[in-house]
């Protein structure tokens, strides 16, 4: 009996050992066949994109929003869209960023660009990060820019008005130019300046002379912001020319250059490779040639949608930048649509400058803004009166229209009547209360501006032999738009 019990015990032990061996083998096989499960942190953008710049940025929590691929729009300017996001999700995301150690540099306030866009900009380590929410579109734009800096003029500073005389006025000067181009100088109440473009290289010495004529003798003009609408030579040429001459550089102080350098993708999509990127590359680097009042190198700042700049007594809103135009959705492949849209608020009045913007810019603007946004006191006509179209004219209301050239046609192709937009310009002139060009001299508007009170200064003496002098020839051909009122 004892022997039988021993045999049963041995059999039981053997079964236990075999069972254990079986489970050991199965566990080993299972471990070898089952891949290791990677834990994905969906609170970070690393869960949604492989782009290196976004790996350490918290993801935006959204119920219905869709994340786009990351696109490079410029000089380290990496854009991600969140289509279908809400204002509440935007505000929650702003709080999330601050909790994650992102330092808020600025925002555009509860006014939210007149109710169209909330925008806030942050810094962390060497990263600048701007979040803009287009309220009408339920669309959030995220722009991550490693190595970029944010302008101090994105924040209001009351001290900039200290010592300003109570009777000081803000004036806008549309400068007389050699040929084609944009050149606007805004003289602020503190005696400093904001410049838009500046014209071609040949206009550079006249621009410097004019700035010096506007300040007390012996003082250097202080340019708080120099905006370049886009990288075409009739807009950035004067700035580049000045930067190459140390004597000219030393005639002015420049606090910052505001320019959006396009990426190779933008050049390829907008121009099918037909645009020379050299001008854009040079303009993107030019700020370092200048010094501010403290002797530091001026910086380049990239204007982004929804940002608001405070220069002394005026505000400038970035109504549109190239980041709002998806590359695959351009209505036309026209590099002019990289022009930035800037809405100026001066003494309660509205002044729009948008460079050479073309169909894409106009149509996107009409989608993003009600027509009331374009109830304009002063309007700088697009592309020197070439890109004038009835559909946009009828969408807006104008009091004063400034022609940035006295011509109705392109100077380089006067034989193409389609560029003249004769009927379209006539419709624009009939739609405004007054129009004026710089054909007889620089035009000056004093704010608050009343229709009919502009002044035309004495025509320039073209004393510098640095460019083709076409003034008399153009006047003789009758291409001058002139002035008028309705």
Per-range role (PLM):
Residues 236-247, 264-274, 391-394, 414-417:
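Metal-dependent catalytic neighborhoods of phosphoester/phosphodiester hydrolases
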Residues 147-221, 291-374, 445-486:
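Core dinuclear metal-dependent hydrolase active-site scaffold
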Residues 1-15:
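N-terminal Sec-pathway targeting helices
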């Amino acid at each position: 009996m004892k022997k039988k019990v021993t045999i049963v015990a041995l059999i039981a032990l053997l079964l236990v050992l075999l069972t254990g061996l079986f489970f050991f083998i199965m566990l080993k096989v299972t471990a070898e066949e089952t891949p290791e499960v990677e834990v994905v942190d969906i609170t970070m953008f690393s869960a949604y994109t492989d782009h290196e710049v976004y790996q350490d940025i918290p993801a935006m929590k959204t119920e219905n929003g869709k994340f786009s691929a990351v696109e490079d729009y410029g000089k380290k300017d990496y854009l991600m869209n969140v289509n279908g996001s809400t204002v509440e999700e935007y505000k929650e995301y702003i709080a999330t960023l601050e909790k994650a150690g992102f330092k808020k540099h600025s925002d555009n306030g509860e006014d939210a660009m007149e109710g169209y866009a909330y925008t806030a900009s942050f810094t962390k380590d060497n990263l600048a990060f701007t979040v803009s929410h287009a309220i009408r579109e339920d669309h959030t734009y995220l722009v991550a820019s490693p190595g970029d800096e944010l302008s101090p003029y994105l924040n209001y500073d009351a001290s900039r008005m200290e010592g300003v005389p109570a009777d000081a006025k803000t004036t806008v000067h549309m400068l007389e130019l050699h040929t084609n181009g944009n050149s606007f100088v805004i003289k602020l109440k503190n005696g400093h300046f904001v410049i838009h473009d500046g014209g071609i290289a040949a206009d550079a010495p006249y621009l410097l002379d004019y700035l010096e004529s506007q300040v007390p003798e012996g003082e250097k003009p202080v340019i708080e912001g120099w905006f370049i609408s886009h990288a075409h030579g009739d807009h950035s040429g004067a700035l580049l020319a000045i930067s190459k001459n140390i004597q000219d550089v030393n005639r002015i102080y420049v606090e910052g250059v505001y320019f959006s350098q396009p990426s190779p993708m933008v050049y390829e999509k907008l121009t099918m490779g037909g645009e020379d990127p050299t001008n854009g590359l040079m303009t993107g680097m030019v700020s370092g040639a200048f010094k501010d009042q403290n002797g530091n190198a001026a910086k380049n700042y990239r204007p982004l949608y929804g940002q608001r700049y405070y220069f002394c007594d005026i505000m400038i809103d970035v109504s549109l930048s190239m980041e709002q135009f998806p590359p695959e959705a351009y209505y036309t492949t026209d590099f002019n649509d990289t022009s930035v849209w800037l809405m100026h608020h001066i003494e309660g009045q509205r002044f729009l400058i948008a460079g050479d913007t073309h169909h894409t810019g106009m149509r996107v603007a009409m989608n993003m803004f009600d027509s009331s946004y374009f109830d304009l006191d002063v309007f700088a006509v697009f592309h020197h009166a070439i890109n004038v179209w009835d559909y946009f004219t009828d969408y807006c209301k104008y009091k004063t229209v400034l022609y940035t050239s006295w011509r109705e046609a392109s100077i380089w192709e006067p034989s193409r009547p389609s560029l003249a937009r004769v009927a379209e310009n006539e419709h624009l002139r009939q739609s405004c209360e007054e129009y004026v060009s710089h054909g007889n001299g620089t035009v000056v508007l004093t704010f608050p501006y009343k229709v009919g009170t502009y002044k035309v200064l004495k025509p320039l003496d073209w004393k510098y032999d640095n460019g083709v002098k076409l003034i008399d020839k153009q006047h003789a051909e009758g291409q001058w738009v002139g002035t008028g009122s309705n």
